[in-house]
Amino acid sequence: MKYLYIICVLFWNITVILVAAPEKAQVMELLEGRHWSLDAEEFHSLGEGTDRLLIEISADKSLINYLRFRALEALSLFPSENTAVFLESFADNSFAPLARRGFEALRRGFFKTQPKRVKKAAVRLLKHRNAQVRISAARFIRSVDAPRFKHFLKSEKNSWVRKAAQE
């Protein structure tokens, strides 16, 4: 009888683990589709661990970029410390299209709860080597720190970047 009880407990624990953690395939399925839109309820319904899978997908260079872009966008739904650190690092170190989307996900996911953190990342990105990333950061700075935005306009070398940042 004791062994039956132990087997039942083990089976229950394994079942809970399998049900609780989302599979990568489930997350990938939510990222696919021709007319994709971010559905917060769908992603949150996958439960705990979804953010870790989205980070894994975002960082996977073997995947096609549109899946990585969508994974970054979905990460904005999971405002944890782990997500913030990943998005900050991603914005600083990735190639331009991913860096810009990483910053935009950071802005969407953390501006209400950690505005100073987002501003700090944006200030760093004002000096990014890619113009599109600088434009994205400058547009954010324009909305939160007018003097710093004016300083950016004075220091930016490319006139088209200055113009785009003001649009």
Predicted regions and their residues:
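Short inter-helical turns and helix N-cap capping residues of alpha-solenoid HEAT/ARM repeat scaffolds
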Residues: 62-64, 94-97, 129-130, 157-160
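Structural detector for internal amphipathic alpha-helices that build alpha-solenoid repeat scaffolds
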Residues: 28-48, 66-80, 89, 100-113, ...
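Amphipathic alpha-helical scaffolding segments comprising HEAT/armadillo-like alpha-solenoid repeats
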Residues: 21-28, 47-59, 80-92, 112-126, ...
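Classical Sec-dependent N-terminal signal peptides that target proteins to the secretory pathway
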Residues: 2-20
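Short, flexible helical or helix-coil boundary motifs
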Residues: 11, 34-38, 61
